[in-house]
């Protein structure tokens, strides 16, 4: 029994001496020389700044999740192109007065990530969506403030999803 353990330990030490080691697959993600161009996303929705907000949240989330490279459109290694296809609001529940009480805001995004040097598409996805609820009332400012907060939340959630995928890709 002891002999089997000693043989197993000897094999482990021999394998570690050969130069093999476990390493994270995200070495490029943390490489400070990597440049990513995350331009404002094209906006096909009725929300005026939707494309710019989603791209800004994506840059923030990439930094937060450990990206150490730089952002810029001069000499990038990777190009992130996106399009906000729609931001729609649907009535989710009605109050006693038959007016909407709770609404559901949905963000739909298309994204494409290109490796500039090789010219290949690393990732392309259409119809990614995130949803958040918000309350509405008789006061238009109250409703619009809640709608904006819901939009900021779904933009943040979308950025987290995109950032997690980019972390795996890079």
Task: Give the location of each predicted region.
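Conserved acidic
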Residues: 46, 50, 101, 146, ...
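Sec-dependent bacterial lipoprotein signal peptides
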Residues: 1-17
């Amino acid at each position: 029994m002891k002999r089997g353990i000693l043989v197993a330990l000897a094999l482990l030490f021999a394998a570690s001496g050969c130069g093999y080691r476990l390493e994270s697959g995200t070495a490029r993600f943390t490489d400070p020389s990597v440049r990513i161009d995350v331009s404002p996303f094209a906006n096909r929705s009725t929300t005026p700044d939707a494309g710019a907000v989603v791209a800004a949240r994506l840059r923030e989330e990439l930094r937060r999740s450990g990206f150490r490279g730089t952002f810029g459109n001069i000499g990038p290694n990777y190009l992130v192109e996106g399009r906000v296809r729609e931001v729609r609001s649907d009535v989710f529940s009605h109050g006693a007065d038959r007016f909407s009480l709770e609404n559901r805001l949905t963000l739909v995004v298309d994204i494409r990530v290109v490796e500039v040097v090789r010219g290949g598409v690393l990732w392309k996805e259409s119809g990614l969506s995130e949803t958040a609820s918000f309350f509405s009332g008789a006061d238009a400012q109250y409703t619009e403030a809640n709608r904006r907060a819901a939009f900021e939340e779904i933009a943040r959630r979308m950025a987290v999803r995109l950032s997690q995928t980019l972390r795996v890709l890079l």
